[in-house]
Amino acid sequence: SGAAPVTKIDITKTQVSLTVNGPDGLLTWTWSGGVVSTSNTQSTQVSSTPFDPAQFALDKIPSILTTAARLAGSESNQSLQIVEYNAGTVLMTVTTRPETRPVFFRADGSVINVLDFTTTQGMAEGLKDAVGASPLVRSITFDPAHGIVVDAPEQNSTASQNGKDLVIRRTRSAKLPVWSVPRQDDSPADLFSPTDVDPAVLAALVDASSKDRKNSDVPKLTIDMSHATSLPTITVDTDDAHTVHDLQGRDITNEVT
């Protein structure tokens, strides 16, 4: 590809295709059967975030495909694609034909798991993914419909638009990678460090509150600074209860306003 920015890589058992955004538009280089060919490409990939293939664990492709086959339940006509997933985040995705569920991998080759938020492991991975690189956040919420949602200040800008702060909302659902959406918010909110939040405590609160309940009544958790305490609090809401907890999970409902 030379110095042209790479926007997509497709790999199957029989061929490798690499798409670059060159001076004359998108160009795809394809290796198949020892022969390299090129073709112009009509695609929305022209707007995709370019990436450096060397930053991806291409040496782990055999183990990636093995893991994907195990999780998807099929290795039929596997295809691995590296391309922007959302908001500048480039992921590896393995699909099959006939189609099963796609399996996503990070650049280092680690799998993006389907999560069980009632376990410490599931909550920890979801929280880490949703927080990303944000050193401070406005709020962290969990609910069964969306998974973990983190609102954090836009790190690359200290300015406001129309008097509203720029906020990045990052959502990590149980089955999909993080999806980021910029938004404006004029509501006041004190920031806190997400490292103060223990995923084991959150998982225990979800597990304890959801036992013997219908799935629709799995609790919603909200971690923020809304109770004017020195550290964030965890608010737990179900259809028939509202409690507030400290970061160790202790019920402090009667101690806060």
Predicted features and spans:
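Extracytoplasmic low-complexity, Pro/Thr/Ser/Ala/Gly-rich segments
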Residues: 1-41, 115-156
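A cross-kingdom feature marking solvent-exposed beta-strand/loop segments within repeated
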Residues: 2-5, 45-52, 75-89, 111-126, ...
